[in-house]
């Protein structure tokens, strides 16, 4: 009997050539930062810094499946989805969001992983006609040199980025709404599942620490 594998897929849009998928990569904050609820890069007990996010997967199999499929990935913060949903509920005409990230340890050539993500909506095309598929999601994966900023962060060093793969998916209003709505509801359900226990455990620990300090 084949094992029933647990899938982390939240929502998916698929045609005969393209795929857009959102996946569960949410992680609770450590108890020391319980009020964050979502992990935001705080150091965990094992020394690793974790981030709570929603995975984005785009695939282009217009040239074939298997080795011919182009697959790209990126991550979005949990707050992105209720933000977009609220904008969509206010009769959104245009939307423009871009985000570039560089992370991971450099390889033997000094290059780290780069993701470039773009989510845009344009109700009218360049020809002035209404667009049937006004939403466009673009993800690009590549490599670049990671450079530290004056404030201690990191960014892509100018002139070092090398694109490896890129996929775009055009989506109509209803299908994009379903993607965003289902993902937003999942995030809310996740928060209601993990949040209460995290808060209770933190409050209990805080009370114990205060009681010990008064002895």
Where are these regions (language model features)?
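N-terminal "first-domain core" detector
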Residues: 1-69
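Short, low-complexity cationic-aromatic patches
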Residues: 45-50, 74-76, 128-130, 166-177
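Short, well-structured alpha-helical interface segments that form or flank functional binding sites
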Residues: 51, 68-71, 75-90, 178
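A cross-kingdom feature marking solvent-exposed beta-strand/loop segments within repeated
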Residues: 58-77, 154-169
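Eukaryotic short linear interaction motifs
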Residues: 63-65, 93, 145-146
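Acidic, metal/cofactor-coordinating or nucleic-acid-engaging core segments within structured domains
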Residues: 79-112
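Short, solvent-exposed interaction modules
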Residues: 90, 105-163
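Mixed-charge, glycine-accented linear interaction segment located at domain edges/termini
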Residues: 144-215
